[in-house]
């Protein structure tokens, strides 16, 4: 008996994607969004198969991701934004609850949700991850969404 191995393909054609973008720290989020769109299009998605929803901040991402997932219109959802540490504990609360919320939506709905929200200590770290020194984490999230959408269709 052979071992069956499942692995999602990086082919986005025919798939529909929802993207939730936090407007807070928009100068970073817009670069991440560019990476998401680039990643999806390069792997065969059409612009008509991408729907983008902007939310005020990272804390609001899970609710809109849940609404998108429950609509059953999307094969995968991509969440992007930037939470940058400040001098108060606010960062910890927002990053923690947003992360848990996104994971809960994915587990509750069975829709893959790619986590492309930067949680960094400095603005410089965020800039590095939004298309400069460390690549674009939006692009990486798009590739993750494609792979997971295809993998879940196989299982």
Swiss-Prot record:
Entries under CDD domains matching the protein: Lumazine_synthase-I
Keywords associated with the record: Riboflavin biosynthesis, Transferase
InterPro entries associated with the record: LS, LS/RS, LS/RS_sf
Pathway where it operates: Cofactor biosynthesis; riboflavin biosynthesis; riboflavin from 2-hydroxy-3-oxobutyl phosphate and 5-amino-6-(D-ribitylamino)uracil: step 1/2
EC number: 2.5.1.78
Reaction equations catalysed: (2S)-2-hydroxy-3-oxobutyl phosphate + 5-amino-6-(D-ribitylamino)uracil = 6,7-dimethyl-8-(1-D-ribityl)lumazine + phosphate + 2 H2O + H(+)
GO biological process terms held by the UniProt record: riboflavin biosynthetic process
First-level EC class: transferase
Active site: 90 (proton donor)
Entry-linked Gene3D superfamilies: Lumazine/riboflavin synthase
Family per similarity comment: Belongs to the DMRL synthase family.
Protein name in UniProt: 6,7-dimethyl-8-ribityllumazine synthase
Natural source organism: Acetivibrio thermocellus (strain ATCC 27405 / DSM 1237 / JCM 9322 / NBRC 103400 / NCIMB 10682 / NRRL B-4536 / VPI 7372) (Clostridium thermocellum)
């Amino acid at each position: 008996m052979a071992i069956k191995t499942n692995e999602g393909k990086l082919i986005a054609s025919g798939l529909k994607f929802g993207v939730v973008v936090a407007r807070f720290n928009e100068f970073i989020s817009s670069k991440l969004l560019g990476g998401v769109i680039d990643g999806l299009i390069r792997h065969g998605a059409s612009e008509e198969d991408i729907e983008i929803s902007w939310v005020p901040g990272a804390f609001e991402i899970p609710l809109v991701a849940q609404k998108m997932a429950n609509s059953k219109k999307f094969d995968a959802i991509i969440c992007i934004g930037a939470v940058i540490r400040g001098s108060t504990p606010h960062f910890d609360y927002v990053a923690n609850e947003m992360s848990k919320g996104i994971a809960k939506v994915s587990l509750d709905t069975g829709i893959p949700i790619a986590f492309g929200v930067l949680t960094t200590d400095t603005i410089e770290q965020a800039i590095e991850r939004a298309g400069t020194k460390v690549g674009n984490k939006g692009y990486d999230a798009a590739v993750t969404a494609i792979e997971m959408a295809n993998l879940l269709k196989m299982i």
